[in-house]
Structures are given as C-alpha cells and as structure tokens.
Design a protein with these regions (language model features):
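A short, structured active-site edge motif that brings together acidic residues
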Residues: 146-164
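Substrate-recognition element of Asp-dependent hydrolases with the DxDx(T/V) motif
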Residues: 17, 29, 103, 111-142, ...
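Acidic, Mg2+-coordinating phosphoryl-transfer loop and its flanking beta/alpha structural elements
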Residues: 184-210
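N-terminal helical cap/lid subdomain that shapes the substrate entry/recognition surface
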Residues: 5-12, 18-109, 134
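Short beta->alpha linker loops
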Residues: 24, 131-132, 161, 187
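Short loop-to-alpha-helix "cap/lid" segments that border enzyme active sites
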Residues: 160-176
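Glycine-rich phosphate-binding loop signature in dinucleotide/nucleotide-binding domains
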Residues: 3-5, 120-123, 172-181, 199
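A structural signal for isolated positions on well-ordered beta-strands in alpha/beta enzyme cores
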Residues: 124-126, 150, 183, 208-210
C-alpha cells in the first residue's frame, strides 16, 4: 500500500476492474445484437468499437453495432428491455435472488480487504461507473460487502467520457480539501478520456489515469 500513499483519492470503474464482465455485459451485448440482426459480434468487434472511446454505454454500443451492420435498428427502449432480460434475467429493481441472467457469471477481480487497506492507509476511495445502479449496488454491497460505498452509477451523471461524475465524486470525497492526487482506475479508452476531460475542467487538481 505504500506505493499508493501519495494518492489522496482513488476512484474505480467497476466493469473490468472490480468484476469481469466478459461473460455478462459483453455476452448480453452479443446476444442482443444477435437477437435483432442474426449476427453475433465477437470480442474483437466489441473491442474495436470500445477503442473509439465513445461507446462506454453497452446499450448504445449495441445500437451502434446494429447501425454499422445495416438493416433495421430497434427502438432504444425496446433494446434496453431485451438487453436487461439477458443481463439480469429478472426485474432489475427486484430481489437479486430472483435474477437468472448473465449477471450471475461475473468473477470478482478484487477482495473486500483491498478497501479496508486503502482506508487504513488514509486513501479516500469510491466508484464511478456506467453500470446500472442495481447492478453496481449488487456487486459492491452484496458481493463485496461494502457498506454504502461512494458511488456514481448510470443516471447519476452523464455517460463517460463526460467527466461530470468523476469530478462530482472527487469533490464529495475531498470535502473541501485540496487533494494531493486523484487517480481513476479504469479499463477502457473512455476512462482515459474521462480523466483528460477532468483535467481540462479542473486543471487545479492533480488527475491521474491508471
């Protein structure tokens, strides 16, 4: 933990950082596109799209893949319902015990002890994610056992790479103090771009992308 001692605030993405979503969100994206087009994009198709840095939202990524494939594109609300059916396999706002979707196939990439160690080192931490709130709360609170973790999820702020959510949570955790350093740990081009935009909007703060 000493290597991170200079980090006053450490913010995490969730998908691809806290949990592996290759068999859940990515799979739901593939199945959704296949449902509407008969074509199932492979991992490289999705990676190329994500590498553009503008498709952090998997619903919009699904729609964009369908547009580029040609043919009819469904209504966004209808696509979201179909996607959620694959991912949650039940009511997103309902009892997670009744979910039967791909969300059950998400290996954790960290252990709860990590956050105890961060707190013990005086590092303030939280999560900025494009995940739906029920999904984010499920992994953080039920699977990791974190109590009311600082979180910005889908709908709390504009989608990344807009830095609003990142800046907002950093300000909340700073609590009026000037941070020594703010690091954001993500896994996509959109996450890096979010930090770049945060630097432009708050150049007085020391932003770092991990």
């Amino acid at each position: 933990m000493q290597a991170l001692g200079s980090f006053t605030i450490l913010l995490f993405d969730i998908d691809g950082v806290i949990r592996d979503v290759a068999g859940s969100y990515r799979r739901a994206l593939q199945e959704t596109v296949a449902h509407y087009s008969g074509w199932r994009p492979d991992a490289s198709d999705i990676d190329r799209l994500k590498a553009e840095g503008s498709w952090n939202n998997d619903w919009d990524a699904s729609l964009e893949l369908l547009r580029r494939r040609g043919g009819s594109v469904p209504d966004r609300d209808a696509l979201i319902e179909r996607f959620s059916g694959f991912y949650f396999g039940g009511d997103p706002e309902g009892d997670p015990g009744n979910w039967r979707g791909f969300i059950g196939d998400e290996p954790l990439l960290v252990e709860a002890q990590l956050f105890e160690d961060l707190s013990a080192a005086g590092i303030r931490w939280g999560f900025v994610s494009g995940a739906e709130p029920p999904s984010a709360r499920f992994v953080l609170q039920q699977r990791l056992g974190l109590v009311d973790p600082p979180l910005i999820a889908m709908g709390d702020a504009p989608d990344k790479p807009d830095p609003t959510g990142l800046i907002r949570l950093a300000e909340r955790l700073a609590a009026g103090e000037r941070p020594g350093r703010i690091a954001y740990l993500g896994d996509t081009v959109a996450d890096v771009r979010t930090v770049v935009h945060a630097r432009s909007q708050r150049p007085d703060w020391p932003w770092c992308s991990l």
